[in-house]
From Swiss-Prot:
Originating species: Rickettsia bellii (strain RML369-C)
Family: Belongs to the complex I subunit 6 family.
Record-given protein name: NADH-quinone oxidoreductase subunit J
Keywords tagged on the record: Cell membrane, Membrane, NAD, Quinone, Translocase, Transmembrane, Transmembrane helix
Pfam families attached to this UniProt entry: Oxidored_q3 (PF00499)
InterPro entries for this protein: NADH_UbQ/plastoQ_OxRdtase_su6, Nuo/plastoQ_OxRdtase_6_NuoJ
């Protein structure tokens, strides 16, 4: 079904460009969800129904929704960051060129030993399920890249936790040690307020 392949591919490219070019971060996440849905359509065309379902359940149902909640909850000043990048155009261009060169090298090295065919699908053994084929390859030939990917995700999780633990002005925090050290002598304050003064002369620690 070449028409569906080109349809899903075109929609993925358009939605990916919208993810990068959208000024509103919430819209970027919505376009990212749309790209994941079209990617699952490609997986179905290739006969990998398990991967298509995992792409919907994990990426759309968990990761993309998590991105949406994080962006809406954290106070991210994207406009301020964009203005800082505009003040340093040389640095921005240099970083962009490095990332572009990195992508070119990855594409060239990744497609060096691949023999393309006119057929858009590939042969899958009928007696082997998607999960068995993925597990056999993932935990044998790609064992080290799989562990490295897990380590990268672990570092990203630590970074997210660090972002949420930043100190904010005006937020009252508990002092557990001070609360536990209270006794009956310092927990209750006995005082005798002056007439017509109320509690103005009372000092609290």
């Amino acid at each position: 079904m070449p028409i569906f392949f080109y349809l899903f591919t075109t929609l993925i490219i358009i939605s990916s460009l919208c993810v990068v070019l959208s000024k509103n971060s919430v819209y970027s996440v919505l376009w990212l969800i749309f790209a994941f849905i079209n990617g699952s359509g490609l997986m179905i065309l290739l006969g990998a129904e398990f991967l298509a379902m995992m792409l919907i359940v994990i990426y759309v149902g968990a990761v993309a929704v998590l991105f949406l909640f994080v962006i809406m909850m954290l106070d991210m000043h994207f406009n301020k960051a964009i203005m800082q990048l505009k003040e340093k155009p040389i640095l921005s261009i240099f970083v962009s060129l490095i990332m572009f060169a990195d992508l070119v090298v990855i594409i060239l090295l990744g497609t060096k030993n691949i023999h393309f065919s006119s057929d858009l699908s590939f042969a899958i053994a009928s007696d082997v399920s998607n999960t068995k084929a993925i597990g056999k390859i993932l935990y044998t030939d790609f064992m080290i890249p799989f562990q490295i990917a897990g380590l990268i995700l672990f570092v990203a999780m630590i970074g997210c936790i660090t972002l949420t633990l930043r100190k904010r002005d005006g937020v009252k925090r508990q002092n557990i040690a001070k609360q536990l050290s209270h006794n009956k002598e310092n927990a209750v304050l006995m005082t005798k307020p002056l007439i017509n003064k109320g509690i103005e002369n009372i000092k609290y620690e």
